[in-house]
């Protein structure tokens, strides 16, 4: 019987490969994106200290609409919170997901609202 590869295992494998090459610092944190079936989460992470500097998700009260609209709003929120915490330059970590759909909407919204990557 032919077995179909598990999409999430392949995603985690891609994410581990990329994470070996990129790392966030206090000066330039990593913008990490996690996407589930229903929600999307974004965090600014300082990997050196191992702390989250700012975060936003579709669970936040001001986020509503379709999944793509939620991703756009989360991108706007993470950019606003990141700039308020004093971060403008970040390293984008798509988390092994394709740069398409909700991940792309979040990234473009974050760029439009002032984050540089």
Curated annotation (Swiss-Prot):
CDD domains: Ribosomal_L18_L5e. GO terms for biological process: translation. Gene3D superfamilies: 3.30.420.100. Keywords: Ribonucleoprotein, Ribosomal protein, RNA-binding, rRNA-binding. GO terms for molecular function: 5S rRNA binding; structural constituent of ribosome. InterPro entries: Ribosomal_uL18_bac-type (IPR004389), Ribosomal_uL18_bac/euk (IPR005484). It comes from the Bacteria. Pfam families: Ribosomal_L18p. GO terms for cellular component: cytosolic large ribosomal subunit. Part of the 50S ribosomal subunit; part of the 5S rRNA/L5/L18/L25 subcomplex. Contacts the 5S and 23S rRNAs. PANTHER family: 39S RIBOSOMAL PROTEIN L18, MITOCHONDRIAL, LARGE RIBOSOMAL SUBUNIT PROTEIN UL18M. This is one of the proteins that bind and probably mediate the attachment of the 5S RNA into the large ribosomal subunit, where it forms part of the central protuberance. Belongs to the universal ribosomal protein uL18 family. This is Large ribosomal subunit protein uL18. It comes from Leuconostoc citreum (strain KM20). The gene is rplR.
């Amino acid at each position: 019987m032919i077995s179909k590869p598990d999409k999430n295992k392949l995603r985690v494998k891609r994410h581990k490969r990329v994470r070996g090459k990129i790392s966030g610092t206090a000066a330039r944190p990593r913008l990490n994106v996690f996407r589930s079936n229903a929600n999307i989460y974004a965090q600014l992470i300082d990997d050196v200290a191992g702390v989250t500097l700012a975060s936003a998700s579709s669970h936040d009260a001001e986020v509503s609409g379709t999944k793509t609209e939620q991703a756009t709003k989360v991108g706007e929120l993470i950019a606003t919170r990141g700039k308020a915490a004093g971060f403008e330059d970040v390293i984008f970590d798509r988390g092994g997901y394709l740069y398409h759909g909700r991940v792309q909407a979040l990234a473009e919204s974050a760029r439009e609202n002032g984050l540089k990557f």
